[in-house]
Amino acid sequence: MTILNHTLGFPRVGLRRELKKAQESYWAGNSTREELLTVGRELRARHWDQQKQAGIDLLPVGDFAWYDHVLTTSLLLGNVPPRHQNKDGSVDIDTLFRIGRGRAPTGEPAAAAEMTKWFNTNYHYMVPEFVKGQQFKLTWTQLLEEVDEALALGHNVKPVLLGPVTYLWLGKVKGEQFDRLSLLNDILPVYQQVLAELAKRGIEWVQIDEPALVLELPQAWLDAYKPAYDALQGQVKLLLTTYFEGVTPNLDTITALPVQGLHVDLVHGKDDVVELHKRLPSDWLLSAGLINGRNVWRADLTEKYAQIKDIVGKRDLWVASSCSLLHSPIDLSVETRLDAEVKSWFAFALQKCHELALLRDALNSGDTAALAEWSAPIQARRHSTRVHNPAVEKRLAAITAQDSQRANVYEVRAEAQRARFKLPAWPTTTIGSFPQTTEIRTLRLDFKKGNLDANNYRTGIAEHIKQAIVEQERLGLDVLVHGEAERNDMVEYFGEHLDGFVFTQNGWVQSYGSRCVKPPIVIGDISRPAPITVEWAKYAQSLTDKPVKGMLTGPVTILCWSFPREDVSRETIAKQIALALRDEVADLEAAGIGIIQIDEPALREGLPLRRSDWDAYLQWGVEAFRINAAVAKDDTQIHTHMCYCEFNDIMDSIAALDADVITIETSRSDMELLESFEEFDYPNEIGPGVYDIHSPNVPSVEWIEALLKKAAKRIPAERLWVNPDCGLKTRGWPETRAALANMVQAAQNLRRG
């Protein structure tokens, strides 16, 4: 029984973000469709070859996506919302981009599809839309074309397909309500057709992803798996693939399915591999997800070997990444600025492939010498002085309940804030960032590369901040922001100014579409050596009589959007960040900043996948936010911002944050999210986002007014704010001015009644 290895997927964007650059060039009309398609082909060929060279036996094909793999699946099934369809019924790459972005080089602009987080990761997918009586047919053959490409290059191919039940689970019903699970029998013939086409190509194994099987699914959804897979069996071998959690709670459902193998995440799940082996059918292959696909730490391969060795030789076995390597940067070897000791603690996607090769070889041969050598640096890290800061640990241990309480309740604070700010009804503001122009990015890059001295850099940033203030005053906004010209990324910026983080040069991972992020890495205890945001906030406030918000990224979001340590709990990391940023709130307040926004867009996405684990997470997540904010005086208004959220199931926790104002992303869901706040009778102020900043389309005054009137039916108008869905960093100035002018006009119209 020779053990093989494989990955569940590989990063798509390219080491130098080649895909991002090609996408954005095409969208801007600066390159042709054929040039874009060529970049995709080159990247796929390179990535297959890199995995093969690193020692991977079975290469994933179908993990590449032009925007998002769930959206690719929608096109495969012919699930194109009517507003995005071509007049002749055809489907092309611009159809895909219109669904994702709201517009493309061809076709009519229309509202983009809703976007939300992929399980509990920092990746986003485009939510499939379902309508009653919907028809499905094989429409988009990207998977088959890519399989042909890989076969022509001589690769050992394992196609990757998002499974039918998970696909339906991830979607939403539009229009007349019905049970979307009722569409299962309608999509299965398309899956059968795809599997038949793969069988014709001589494919032996297909990786069929059903990550919904790690969730606490309703019984009807669990019951749907058996008939679905009865319909899909027989053409190729199916590797039922799960990740992000364990499968033990749903194992009875899984073992009844007519599949030939099961992949389990042995990093994030608590499944005992020996127990799994006992319960799985003896003729099934087990794919053991031993290498963490969503972090950057080098694996202790001696531990991984010990975890799996007891079942070696007892069944067919593959070793694999826990999930797709999509969530990891590509290659550690190009990081030239990392300290050698710290660098030795990491492994990116290609290094993880090498780890899988080492592990496979050791399991096949019984020789573990190479594993011990590989694991030595990560074992040595446990004793490094760069990891532990006694002062931070002491401060954390001394936290009391009082540290997470504002001095007075919201009603008392609101009165003090009204007296201080004297804002009009329907106050207007933005979420924080303004367009990051080429000039701004060049300025930061020149400074970072040493081509610009500190004085000239500061002068340049000050000019951009001044421009942002002038623009906002001209537009008539009520509460201003400084625009964040100095910030490359809302998490990276804070990480750069906090001890305990390190940064990469090329550690990019895809967030959605062409958007990539370069997460900081938490390597040790976190503290704040000096104020971070105070200087620029104070400068911006000196330029205007209107209030300027101080802008902080909250502790849970910094945690969720960084690569965390694996040797302490997430709670510990979050509270260390909260204590550091608590000092920042106090310093902003002392500098005369009266409104401070602590962004927590990631609060909900950090939820464990199983509801039974939610309470513990929400308890410490809320406490971290309150530790961060509670130092503020009554007349300092604390805002928070959240996006991509469904709130109804965590409203108690949202209210427990005790922010004076919460701004939320609601435009894509047509104010749906406000139902939760209405039903809960949310007591504080709310700014429901009135337009979608992810789309370049400019909303009309009438559209915004209609949304605000809809909001006012749910929330008393005196507690409503008017703002976009999110920061404006990715937009250009022309559409930003136009959209904000319409937003301000809508608010003014409502004030006049």
From Swiss-Prot:
Domain of life assignment: Bacteria
Protein family according to the UniProt entry: Belongs to the vitamin-B12 independent methionine synthase family.
Keywords: Amino-acid biosynthesis, Metal-binding, Methionine biosynthesis, Methyltransferase, Repeat, Transferase, Zinc
Catalytic activity as recorded in UniProt: 5-methyltetrahydropteroyltri-L-glutamate + L-homocysteine = tetrahydropteroyltri-L-glutamate + L-methionine
Associated pathway: Amino-acid biosynthesis; L-methionine biosynthesis via de novo pathway; L-methionine from L-homocysteine (MetE route): step 1/1
EC number: 2.1.1.14
InterPro entries in the record: Cbl-indep_Met_Synth_N, Cobalamin-indep_Met_synthase, Met_Synth_C/arc, UROD/MetE-like_sf
Binding-site list for 5-methyltetrahydropteroyltri-L-glutamate: 17-20, 117, 515-516, 561, 605
HAMAP family: Meth_synth
GO terms, biological process: methionine biosynthetic process; methylation
Function: Catalyzes the transfer of a methyl group from 5-methyltetrahydrofolate to homocysteine resulting in methionine formation.
Protein name: 5-methyltetrahydropteroyltriglutamate--homocysteine methyltransferase
Record: residues binding L-methionine: 431-433, 484, 599
Gene giving rise to this polypeptide: metE
Annotated positions binding Zn(2+): 641, 643, 665, 726
UniProt cofactor(s): Zn(2+)
Catalytic residue list: 694
Lineage per the UniProt record: Bacteria, Pseudomonadati, Pseudomonadota, Gammaproteobacteria, Enterobacterales
Binding-site residues, L-homocysteine: 431-433, 484, 599
Manner of cofactor binding, per the entry note: Binds 1 zinc ion per subunit.
Alphabetical list of Gene3D superfamilies matching this protein: 3.20.20.210
Enzyme class: transferase
Single GO MF descriptor: zinc ion binding
